């Protein structure tokens, strides 16, 4: 499943005093009914937060070589937990010989056999990808749990050695099979020669090495958390199991904003969709994950000017008319969401997706809206791509167990600690871009991206949606609200689009 850019533009309020912020950060496990201290009573410096979630990329996969970029480009070498070969102890030289962390498929059992992991399996290390297009590994429920521990997915002990197996298993069982039937694409990573714009922005502004997707499964459920801090038990897209067709009754953040009189919009890119010539709210609803919620279906009739085409974003940025909270959906029909290629009419090129994000961010930085905005870029889940850091324990949003597991799925018989919603998914990239974002800053606090909701709630004095967002950090540590470090934004390099794109070989 694809989709994904979410931007939030927030009328805000932040801090003249850091003591209340520290208190909020420490008081993370409050109930959903407990309203957060109204930061608007301090200094109103952020009026817009823009947040965007692209598709299916893990932290090691995209930013694993970030410290190497710093070494080569005169950035101070601060702590960042990327790929082990680029993550030596302070002052030591990089290893450059990546550890072989995942067993591969025994070559004696080629397709149509399933991937067999045994004593003859070659050990596979991470490596630099040359192609900017890869076949999609699956990050779904079963695969995510096998990634956690190949031989015992229900174990409390993560080994993170199942990535190659799941990549191979899915490739061999796809119809038609993928090229990479050995699953080694999951161990590939990119660096600044591929994603020069992202590497520059992550180095200049604020990022994190402990930022996780909310659920150990695929896109749809994670994006439900992005909007409402729960999927109400769904681990698959609604309707995967024919008996599970009900829309979510949980309150999305936009419903709460509407009730509180806080302006909001959802921007959708209609390119290459039927909405291109008819970008009405009713048409655009089909390309927004707000459609998963009952309340979302009231938008076309009741709030049609709040579900709008992406062209309106550029107009709002230019004219200084951004709403207080805005979410930008991914340009999936246009192939600009950075998702792995998966029966698409053409390969999905990450450089083209990054170029699209560049256009959104640069438009903001060059506009009158820059002075009081924050743009939060993240990814909806790790895409089944190797990451050396395991998922972390998390607060269940509402106590609901999985409701749509299929016969034979992991956790349908025996159970384990990752069988409900008390663990996050895997790490995903994050860049916080704002005149108030700290320069060259890495946050190390464990959080999933429902922390974006917590930031909104903190800024506006809103109650938490569920126990999950209530338990998150409020993200104020990413900012310096007293003195804006980036009153004048930097001039980033243009994102390269000259990389090779092919699916029929690796690397």
Locate the predicted segments by residue.
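Bacterial N-terminal signal peptides that target proteins for export
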Residues: 1-9
């Amino acid at each position: 499943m694809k989709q994904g850019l979410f931007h939030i533009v927030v009328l805000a309020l932040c801090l003249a005093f850091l003591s209340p912020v520290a208190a909020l950060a420490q008081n993370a496990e409050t109930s959903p009914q407990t309203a957060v201290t109204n930061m608007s009573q301090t200094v109103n410096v952020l009026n817009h937060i823009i947040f965007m979630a692209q598709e299916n990329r893990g932290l090691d996969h995209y930013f694993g070589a970030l410290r190497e970029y710093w070494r080569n480009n005169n950035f101070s070498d601060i702590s960042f937990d990327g790929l082990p070969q680029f993550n030596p102890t302070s002052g030591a030289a990089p290893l450059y010989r990546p550890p072989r962390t995942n067993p591969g498929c025994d070559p004696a059992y080629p397709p149509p056999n399933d991937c067999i992991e045994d004593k003859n399996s070659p050990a596979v290390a991470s490596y630099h990808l040359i192609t900017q297009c890869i076949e999609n590994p699956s990050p779904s429920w079963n695969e995510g749990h096998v990634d956690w521990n190949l031989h015992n997915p229900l174990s409390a002990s993560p080994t993170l050695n199942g990535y190659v197996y799941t990549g191979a298993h899915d490739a061999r069982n796809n119809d038609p099979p993928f090229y990479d039937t050995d699953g080694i694409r999951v161990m590939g990573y990119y660096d600044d020669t591929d994603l020069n714009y992202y590497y520059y922005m992550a180095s200049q502004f604020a990022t994190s090495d402990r930022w996780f997707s909310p659920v150990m499964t695929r896109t749809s459920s994670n994006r439900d958390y992005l909007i409402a801090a729960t999927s109400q038990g769904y681990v698959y897209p609604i309707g995967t199991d024919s008996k599970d067709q009900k829309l979510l009754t949980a309150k999305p953040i936009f419903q709460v904003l509407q009730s509180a009189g806080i302006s909001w919009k959802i921007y959708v890119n209609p390119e290459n969709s039927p909405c291109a010539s008819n970008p009405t709210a009713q048409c655009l609803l089909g390309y927004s994950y707000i459609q998963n919620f009952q309340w979302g279906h009231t938008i076309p009739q009741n709030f049609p000017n709040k579900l709008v085409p992406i062209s309106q974003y550029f107009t709002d940025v230019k004219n200084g008319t951004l709403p207080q909270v805005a979410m930008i959906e991914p340009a999936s029909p246009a192939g600009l969401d950075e998702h792995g290629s998966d029966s698409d009419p053409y390969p999905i090129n990450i450089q083209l997706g990054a170029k699209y994000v560049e256009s959104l961010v640069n438009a903001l930085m060059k506009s009158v809206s820059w002075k009081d905005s924050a743009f939060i870029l993240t990814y909806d889940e790790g895409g089944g791509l190797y990451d050396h850091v395991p998922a972390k324990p998390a607060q269940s949003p509402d106590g609901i167990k999985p409701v749509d597991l299929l016969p034979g799925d992991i956790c349908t018989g025996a159970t384990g600690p990752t069988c409900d919603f008390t663990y996050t998914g895997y790490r995903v990239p994050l860049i916080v871009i704002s005149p108030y974002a700290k320069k060259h800053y890495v946050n190390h606090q464990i959080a999933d991206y429902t922390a974006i909701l917590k930031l909104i709630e903190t800024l506006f004095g809103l109650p938490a949606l569920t126990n999950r967002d209530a338990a998150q950090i409020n993200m104020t540590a990413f900012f310096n609200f007293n003195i804006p470090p980036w009153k004048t934004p930097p001039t980033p390099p243009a994102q390269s689009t000259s990389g090779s794109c092919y699916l029929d070989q690796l690397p």
